[in-house]
Regions:
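Extended mid-to-C-terminal alpha-helical interaction segments
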Residues: 1-125
Length: 125
């Protein structure tokens, strides 16, 4: 019984570690202003994109959700803590078009990037 529990625990740790490695690679690419496409992330982890996708599926994780999560965090940080233009932020975090960024911000934050910036800066720190 203890051996089985240990195996289950180790499997969970391995799965968690893989997702974390993928997220770290995504974050590195986005922070460098590069596109976090699955091919680039897979190459950074020395595997094919199909293997990366299969391993994430095994953990019930979807690649684009990980990218979306990190883009959202970077957008929040840039809007809250920098004076960079909305357009510059959009391109920096991997959007091909500022209007796509605006639509995505509406989904993430419920308003435009400019409105979110005003709102977040009015909050007490």
């Amino acid at each position: 019984a203890n051996e089985q529990i240990m195996r289950q625990y180790l499997n969970r740790v391995r799965q968690y570690s893989f997702t974390v490695r993928v997220e770290e690679e995504i974050e590195e690419l986005l922070k460098a202003g590069e596109s976090a496409r699955i091919q680039a992330v897979a190459a950074g982890l020395n595997m094919s994109s199909r293997t990366l996708q299969r391993r994430l599926e095994g953990e019930r994780t979807i690649f684009m959700q990980l990218v979306d999560k990190h883009r959202k965090q970077l957008a929040h940080d840039a809007l809250a803590h920098t004076e960079r233009s909305i357009t510059e932020i959009a391109y920096t975090i991997g959007f091909s078009d500022p209007s796509n960024f605006s639509r995505t911000c509406a989904r993430w934050f419920g308003c435009s990037p400019a409105a979110y910036r005003r709102r977040i800066r009015q909050l007490p720190t």
